[in-house]
Design a protein with these regions (language model features):
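Short Fe-S-cluster ligation motifs
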Residues: 235-239, 243-280
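Short, Lys/Arg- and Gly-enriched loop/turn segments at beta-strand edges
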Residues: 42-51, 89-99, 237
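Local cysteine-cluster metal-coordination motifs and their immediate loop/turn environment
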Residues: 112, 190-191, 212-242, 270-276
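Structural signal for conserved beta-strand scaffold positions within catalytic alpha/beta enzyme cores
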Residues: 6, 51, 154-156, 209, ...
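FNR/FR-type flavoprotein reductase catalytic core
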Residues: 68-216
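A generic structural signal for residues embedded in beta-strands
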Residues: 36, 84-85, 227
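Ferredoxin-reductase
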Residues: 1-80
Length: 280
């Protein structure tokens, strides 16, 4: 029984659920993920762990409502339970020994970036946080980032909050000015991570990307999350989700991400119709 103990809407399309899962909370580390099913007939959704409280036995997940599965998950209320909650899965982000790190997040990917920034801060690492959103209304987790970052920069596409522009602008400025980052860790849309890597590679700044492709079982059996990394096939669920950004084939990953769009659109429409019927 994985009960929802707290629910919070972070913006009009992004929701945080705090779920009682003591065994997962006991072992969870920053960068790992879970697979959740809202109901018995729901699709399996991989979501990176956004936070955990070992004493209370709670695990937080943050998701954007985009398809049928996340719509079903978003329909659950405090006191209700999700059907499945499996994890922690994947490898934790490697942060030991890092002294000066820039964490770059984009959109809902900031939910993944936050626990990594927090873990770095807790071990005494200097953390520069750069996050990007389309506009002011979509900004999430600002207070939480400010609490764990030595320097924090918000970028918005339209300039309605923070600075106007994309995350690569302040990142390149920091590198050119001699920030001397040990590593850049980036999580967000594939196109954003691709351009972060294009920014850091000429300066030879090690860059780790968190890959979150389509996934079914989370154990490497289905092969749905395969990626090409350094010319070899890797599976995000067991080999990742973190990879050397210099070696990831982003173009292939973006192409694979579009393969199921028609099916997702059909499932979303069907779920919308069901929700309308329930309201009526």
């Amino acid at each position: 029984m994985f009960t929802i103990v707290k629910r919070r809407e972070l913006n009009p399309t992004v929701t945080e659920l705090c779920i009682h899962a003591p065994l997962i909370a006991k072992k969870a580390k920053a960068g790992q993920f879970i697979i959740v099913r809202a109901k018995e007939d729901s699709e399996r959704i991989p979501l990176t762990i956004a936070g955990f409280d070992r004493e209370a036995g709670n695990v937080s997940i943050i998701f954007q409502v985009v398809g049928a599965g996340t719509m079903q998950l978003n329909s659950l209320k405090e006191g209700e339970a999700v059907h499945d909650f499996v994890g922690p899965l994947g490898k934790a982000t490697e942060i030991e020994g890092l002294k000066n790190v820039c964490v770059v997040g984009g959109g809902v990917g900031c939910a993944i970036a936050l626990p990594i920034a927090q873990a770095l801060h807790e071990q005494g690492t200097k953390v520069t946080g750069i996050v990007g959103f389309r506009n002011k209304d979509l900004v999430i987790l600002e207070d939480e980032f400010r609490a764990c970052c030595d320097e924090f920069i918000i970028m918005t596409d339209d300039g309605s909050y923070g600075e106007k522009g994309v995350v690569t602008a302040p990142l390149e400025k920091k590198i050119v000015e001699g920030a001397n980052f040990d590593e850049v860790i980036t999580i967000g849309p594939l196109i954003m991570m691709k351009f972060v890597v294009k920014t850091t590679k000429p300066h030879n700044v090690k860059t780790v990307v968190s890959m979150n492709p389509i996934m079914v079982d989370g154990t490497g059996m289905c092969g749905g999350c395969r990626l090409t990394v350094g010319g070899q096939t890797k599976f995000a669920c067991v080999d990742g989700p973190d990879f050397d950004g210099f070696e990831v084939d982003f173009d292939e990953a973006m192409h694979r991400g579009t393969m199921y769009k028609p099916f997702e659109a059909h499932a979303r429409e069907a779920e919308c119709n069901l929700l309308k019927q329930e309201v009526q």
